[in-house]
Curated annotation (Swiss-Prot):
Keyword Kinase attributed: yes
Single GO MF annotation: ATP binding
Source organism superkingdom: Eukaryota
Organism: Danio rerio
Residue ranges with Polar residues bias: 46-62
Compositional bias of kind Basic and acidic residues: 405-414
Catalytic residue list: D216 (proton acceptor)
Protein name, per record: Serine/threonine-protein kinase H1 homolog
Residues annotated as binding ATP: I102, G103, R104, G105, S106, F107, S108, R109, V110, K125
Gene that produces this protein: pskh1
Length: 422
């Protein structure tokens, strides 16, 4: 959901170099430990980052204050905000005016800020690097974001470091998550779907060219830049990303991802390539056209077996109204064999994407898609098994529920090997 009062950052100029990203030497004293819980701005991060890391790209929603809290006096609120700002590293507050706490996690806080000179809004993500997992996430994100410059990938603007914390100044996305936008729209056609996928595929192709594999592509990590109808989509949250010199040729082994979006080759612990991102995009494409998941089961082992078989259906609404070309696109990315799966470059050349569904029906699929999305969201609200990354969650409880459990994967791999050996 968008923030009507937020300014919109201009598109980054093509000639801006990566020297925008600079390192500030560690400060000798570390100044703050506590944060106010609610700043009244009604904002939260667009998606979780690994191990509870709040993402630096903000999704803005109309969340009310905690139900049990009475509105506090204005003077008391101002004092609390002033005290909160005073705890920030002085080099940060000298340059940025802290406006609101918009996200939090086990090892991070995210605040909405304004540049004091330009008045441009940004998000600052603070990561506690004294913890091992915090350091790992920070290193992963910085390794990627310092290298990339693409219109469909969130941009890192500046970095401040202290002995125990890192502050990443990033673009602020105010347009909300991909599927939130679809639900609020009155219309959604196949052509609209191809516009979204073109932008995401452009970003993924760019990442893969640099040898970067995201490894956690999902709707929560695809944010709209601003609330306008012409907003671009941006890929965010690189806490699980892997960086290699040549992404297609280098094999990865780490078991990570979000269960419903994870590729079969990861589940059976085979060395894998950046083709895992394309599998996740296949899942996203399926949801984009139907509002439902191709693979879903509350029982994790049954879910994994579905993924390994790669069997899904095009039954139920609105699939009868979806073109065969769109279904062919999904079939070619949701291919169990990664060698047969379309690459990002090949996917961009698929007739359905190239023609922007020109030969498809322009029937409005919005009603069925939004109803299915809302139905799924409602059912997930009553379960702790929300779609969180293996190293991320909005709460400890949901994190444990959604983690790729080592015991389950060992059992799955044992059964898979038994089947292969006959």
């Amino acid at each position: 959901m968008g923030c009507r009062t937020s300014k919109v950052l201009p598109e980054p100029p093509g000639d801006v170099q990566l020297d925008l990203v600079k390192k500030v030497e560690p400060h000798q004293t570390d100044v703050y430990k506590n944060f106010i819980k609610y700043d009244g701005g009604g904002e939260k991060t667009g998606s979780p980052s690994p191990q509870g890391q709040s993402q630096a790209v903000a999704k803005v929603s109309q969340s009310p204050p905690p139900a049990n809290d009475q509105p506090e006096p204005a003077d008391s609120h101002r004092k609390k905000v002033a005290k909160y700002r005073a705890k920030f590293d002085p080099r940060v507050t000298a340059k940025y005016d802290i406006k609101a706490l918009i996200g939090r996690g086990s090892f991070s806080r995210v605040v909405r800020v304004e540049h004091r000179s330009t008045r441009q809004p940004y998000a600052i993500k603070m990561i506690e690097t004294r913890y091992r997992e915090g350091r790992e996430v920070c290193e992963s994100e910085l390794c990627v974001l310092r290298r990339v410059r693409h219109t469909n990938i969130i941009q890192l603007m500046e970095v401040f470091e202290t002995a125990e914390r890192v502050y990443m100044v990033m673009e602020l996305a105010t347009g909300g998550e991909l599927f939130d936008r679809i639900i609020t729209r009155g219309s959604f056609t196949e052509r609209d779907a191809t516009r979204v996928l073109q932008m995401v595929l452009d970003g993924v192709k760019y990442l893969h060219t640099l040898g970067i594999t995201h490894r956690d592509l999902k709707p929560e990590n695809l944010l709209y830049y601003h609330p306008g109808a012409d907003s671009k989509i941006m890929i965010t949250d690189f806490g699980l990303a892997s960086t290699r010199k040549k992404g297609d040729e280098c094999l990865m082994k780490t078991t990570c991802g979000t269960p419903e979006y994870i590729a079969p080759e990861i589940l059976v612990r085979k060395p894998y390539t950046n083709a895992v991102d394309m599998w996740a995009l296949g899942v996203i494409s399926y949801i984009l056209l139907s509002g439902t998941m191709p693979f879903e089961d509350d029982n994790r082992m049954r879910l994994y077996r579905q993924i390994l078989k790669g069997k899904y259906s095009f039954s139920g609404e609105p699939w009868p109204s979806v073109s065969n070309l769109a279904k062919d696109f999904i079939d070619r990315v949701l291919t169990v064999d990664p060698n047969e799966r379309l690459s990002a470059g090949q996917a961009l050349k698929h007739p359905w994407i190239v023609s922007m569904a020109a030969s498809s029906s322009m029937k409005n699929l919005h009603r069925s898609i939004s109803q299915n999305l809302l139905k799924r969201a409602s059912s997930r609200c009553h379960s702790t098994k929300s779609s969180q990354s293996t190293r991320s969650s909005r709460s400890t409880k949901s994190s444990k529920a959604r983690r790729l459990r080592e015991k389950e994967l060992r059992e799955l791999n044992r059964r898979y090997q038994q089947q292969c050996n006959g």
